[in-house]
Amino acid sequence: MSQDVFKHLTSKQVQRTRARSFGASFERPLASFLPKKENKNLLSNAARVKLLTFSSSSPYSFSYSPVLSRDANDGYIPLDTSSRANLWESVTDYDLQHANEPLVGNYYISTEALGDGLNRSPFTINPEKRRSLSDISYVPIPHKEHSNWPVHCSSQAIVTTSNTTFSIWSANDYFCLLFGYAGSQLNRHSVFDIFPKSFSSHLSNLIVSFPIDNEHERILFCGDVFPVITVDGVRLMDFWVKEKQGKLIWILEFVEESYIDIKLQDGVAVDERTEQPLTSDLLPSRLPKTWDQRLYLTTKTTEGYYCPSMIYPLSKSSFQYIIFHYAAGLLFINSDFKIISLNEALFESMLGYSDLLTKDISLIFPDFKLVLQQLADSHALDPGRVVSEIHVRHAYRTCTADKMKKADYPYLIHSDGNIIQIDCQIISVSPHSVKSNEPAFGVWLIFDSVDNRASDFVRSMRSSVILEEVVISDESEEEEDLSADEDYVDSEWEVVPHNIASYTTIKELGIGAYGQVKLATYKSNKVHEVILKSISKSRILLDSWMRDKDLGTVPMEISILHFLKAHSHPNIVKMITFFEDNENYYLLTEPQKPGIDLFDYIELKPSISEKESKAIFFQIALAVAHLHSFDIIHRDIKDENVILEGNGCARLIDFGSSSLTKNGPFDTFRGTVGFAAPELLRGEKYLGKEQDIWALGILLYTIVYRENPYYNIEEILDAKLRIPFELSKDNVDLICRMLDRNVHDRITIEETLQHHWFDDIRYLDTSHIRIPLSS
């Protein structure tokens, strides 16, 4: 079974099924937890059907491959997220909060459910919630300390290369940001330039050892962890690499970790940052010399918990000590409790074992059989049912009540002998099967060091002699104001302060790779509320600067919004002004109050009528037509970037990815992967307008069907568009024409506005087409 499907089966009713790119609750992508390797003699064809192994052309509801391997031809690259379980939450408190929940959820695996053509997600607890590969998860921005910041646009760095020379053909902006590349210079680099020299030769030899296959598709890596050199130093990233039609598609994602860079000085291990010796009990007696000799171990926190850890060499005398904050993986066992499928790369990082296939699960989960028996006695293991982590905890406490417990939670045994407390979810696949090659149960294991406890422990493990850091209470107030001497005067907004110290934050709206977004007021006049976006100068890509005849050299976003201020449109956000200091640009836009973004609106509405869908979408199409008439492209059209005001006006916001067509053709794509056109993922150069149309098609599909049409890169590239139901013939025709994979046949924005679906509203007052905001 795919980790995406399992995640969807086991998501809690109180949790969202989609994460946000800004302002979301902390969530972790499950992309690294697909089962990677299988023993082909263990899994029968019947088992594959039960595990939802359908090709991308399958008519069934899900089209994921449960097992990805280096010689697989039908594997999919994961692009989804999952909610994190709070491992450290009090069991008693949790039980009280969920006392009225049934023992197991009412979700089943069945071919009838899979064949339900009207419901893409038959297993969801709340079918009115949506899933989307556009989900943006919180991952650490490259920095010396672990950070729980969400990354705007995409938490995944994506790059397309040749499968022979490994030269870079195209990449997304997040890849360029992480590695300091200009989009116009990508083709000068090989993908191996991002790796440490000592490791790049190892990886290149490994990839070259795979015979080239230009006719078939296969997964080379899935969830493997490799070191890379970012602009902020060496970091670990999860890798998924797929070979397809003579090219390699690479997806990179940061590992949630804390780390210490170590160097040896006269035989003493020293923290490179503090130049102080490390405590003697921190390191093993013998350090690895090569990547293949990397050490997997556990680290005990100050609170007594153990975290999975790793040590690997950077050079002969320098090393990196990693403490993993989060790990989760899916494995399958047969009726004899032998492991028959798992992601080996993941479990090696998590538990230090590289050979768990065919081993008894008791090797790593000694109480599993007792827990399973307890659940069986409660009739919780009917075929197809999923047992949540809280009920597994309850079963664990019950079955271990009469013996000395090693932990308050279910736990795994690391290869070094220490225990790692985890949460566990169990799905009953074929519990009564006696075939050794057929899965009886799927087991989802989750380790989560919540609230940066591992990060705090890294600081506590350093030598007691640590240099004190100076803390400045409000650095921004000390900075020199580089903007105009006089405050900006607007007829509506009166005097707008041009100093960040003059603003009071009302609410944090989001933190991204490029800066922050806040709802703020003037300290001198708190009646006025503004959206205040800070843009870090150090993180602006080289290709994102614009020489503006009025403003000088400024970020592209500011230049375009300044132009649109003079050429305004009622369905486009309006900039008030901007200013800067030594570190940031500050962009002020009008707040849309009262208002709600389209993402939340779709989530909260039980249904959206055709009239309402049409009114919302037509306004956004008008906004895009206005942009395209000035050769401006948005490049990040999605439901999160559409605000619905209380009066029914829909506005397009967030121009952080926008550009001008004259700067094209482009080889660096921006925005959200779930709304990316297939030609972008194929590494082709693009002009921009056609890609905005594709994103509009995804947006309309999302409004109508409450889900994204494509759940992974494979589907974006090849899958046939699935229409769950027909809202109207004209609506379906418009969606299909916008989502035409042939760029040259794709409808234009002018043709979109002239489509028959809009015949009944086209000649109304387009300045404010009222949306019937029904409850």
UniProtKB/Swiss-Prot annotation:
Main localization is cytoplasm
At the top level of its lineage, which domain of life is listed?
Eukaryota
SUPFAM superfamilies to which the protein is assigned, alphabetical: Protein kinase-like (PK-like), PYP-like sensor domain (PAS domain)
Q: Which Pfam families match?
A: PAS_9 (PF13426), Pkinase (PF00069)
Query: What does the record give as the active site?
Result: 636
In this protein, which residues make up the domain named Protein kinase? 503-758
Tell me the residue numbers annotated for binding ATP. Answer: 509-517, 533
Q: Write out the GO biological process terms.
A: intracellular signal transduction; negative regulation of glycogen biosynthetic process; regulation of establishment or maintenance of cell polarity
| GO-annotated cellular components | cytoplasm; cytosol; nucleus
Give GO terms: molecular function aspect only.
Answer: ATP binding; protein serine kinase activity; protein serine/threonine kinase activity
**Its catalytic activity?**
L-seryl-[protein] + ATP = O-phospho-L-seryl-[protein] + ADP + H(+); L-threonyl-[protein] + ATP = O-phospho-L-threonyl-[protein] + ADP + H(+)
State which Enzyme Commission number(s) the record gives. 2.7.11.1
- Look at the named UniProt entry and state the broad enzyme category this protein falls under: transferase
The record's listing under PANTHER family reads:
MAP/MICROTUBULE AFFINITY-REGULATING KINASE (PTHR24346), PAS DOMAIN-CONTAINING SERINE_THREONINE-PROTEIN KINASE (PTHR24346:SF51)
The UniProt similarity line reads:
Belongs to the protein kinase superfamily. Ser/Thr protein kinase family.
Q: What is this protein called?
A: Serine/threonine-protein kinase ppk6
Taxonomic source organism:
Schizosaccharomyces pombe (strain 972 / ATCC 24843)
Give the gene symbol.
Answer: ppk6
